[in-house]
Amino acid sequence: MTNTLVSTSKFLSLILRHAPETIGLALDANGWADVDQLLARAASHGNAISREQLDEVVARDSKTRYAFSDDGLRIRANQGHSLAAVDIGLPPAVPPAVLYHGTASRFVASIREQGLRPGARNHVHLSATPDTAVSVGARHGKPVVLLIDTAAMQAQGQVFHVAANGVWLVEAVAAAFITFP
């Protein structure tokens, strides 16, 4: 993506995941925003985005962070929200027996003590492949991949969801379900 598209994607991430109020935008309970309102409010706050740019960001985003509604009139982030009022309405899903979590090595000691918590987000994010987890962990420093025993978690009643982009979501992961390198 060009620098302009990367900037637009970062702006969308802020607005659709964390702070729609910064441009006076309201998300519905499932995280959807009206596209016309998003574009108008963004422009009125100095971030002019054309519909063509928006379409291109959504289409070219390698992590499939955003989705349009079937009619193309609404947009939302597929996961990663920190807004407590947003429930993107994903049904429970049965994960593979093992999923992966990518993190930076400097966080491993804390995770050993506390497990994985969502922090400022609504869910802990898990990856289906070790390669994806490595790339996630590398964003924050020297990557470490943790193995998550999702079969044991499910046996104890934990509920999983899978976002449209393949990211697995769960409320938290106790350290007992994590295999550390």
Regions found by a protein language model. Name each.
Residues M1-V124, A128-P181:
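Conserved NAD+-utilizing ADP-ribose enzyme module
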